[in-house]
């Protein structure tokens, strides 16, 4: 198992020094989903929600969240993101909305946390916009699907 990098030799938390690492193009793709009542799902799917375009607002929230990740995760480096996109897939058979995020940067550290944060905030935004009609929505299956770039190279979830 690899050593935990956010702790120094005496066990104290610290921000990893990435100053000597080369800048490389880095990509991370993450996903998650939210399941809801069929009536709630139909409201989102048809765009008939009184608060407006639920998925459009969730997309903007996810992008904003990716840019604020370092403010939320204490030892996460602030990054200059070069691209963030969110894709939603609607499955009416399970009343589930899946969110997939692709985040990119060119720099000395990866964008996994930015992609994961974007997924979670997008799903939370859907929950927030729909909670008046469905408090029983369930978010889950949030995970990193793949990452590339840097010293560790390519990684894909098996």
UniProtKB/Swiss-Prot annotation:
Molecular function in Gene Ontology: cyclic pyranopterin monophosphate synthase activity
Entry binding sites for substrate: 75-77, 113-114
Associated pathway: Cofactor biosynthesis; molybdopterin biosynthesis
Swiss-Prot/TrEMBL GO biological process terms: Mo-molybdopterin cofactor biosynthetic process
Keywords: Lyase, Molybdenum cofactor biosynthesis
EC number: 4.6.1.17
Keyword Lyase: yes
InterPro entries per the UniProt record, alphabetical: MoaC, MoaC_bact/euk, MoaC_sf, MoCo_biosynth_MoaA/MoaC, Mopterin_CF_biosynth-C_dom
Catalytic activity: (8S)-3',8-cyclo-7,8-dihydroguanosine 5'-triphosphate = cyclic pyranopterin phosphate + diphosphate
UniProt-annotated catalytic positions: 128
SUPFAM superfamilies, alphabetized: Molybdenum cofactor biosynthesis protein C, MoaC
NCBIfam families with a match to the protein in the record: moaC, PRK09364.1
Similarity field: Belongs to the MoaC family.
Task performed by this protein: Catalyzes the conversion of (8S)-3',8-cyclo-7,8-dihydroguanosine 5'-triphosphate to cyclic pyranopterin monophosphate (cPMP).
Subunit annotation: Homohexamer; trimer of dimers.
Protein name per its UniProtKB record: Cyclic pyranopterin monophosphate synthase
Organism: Polynucleobacter asymbioticus (strain DSM 18221 / CIP 109841 / QLW-P1DMWA-1)
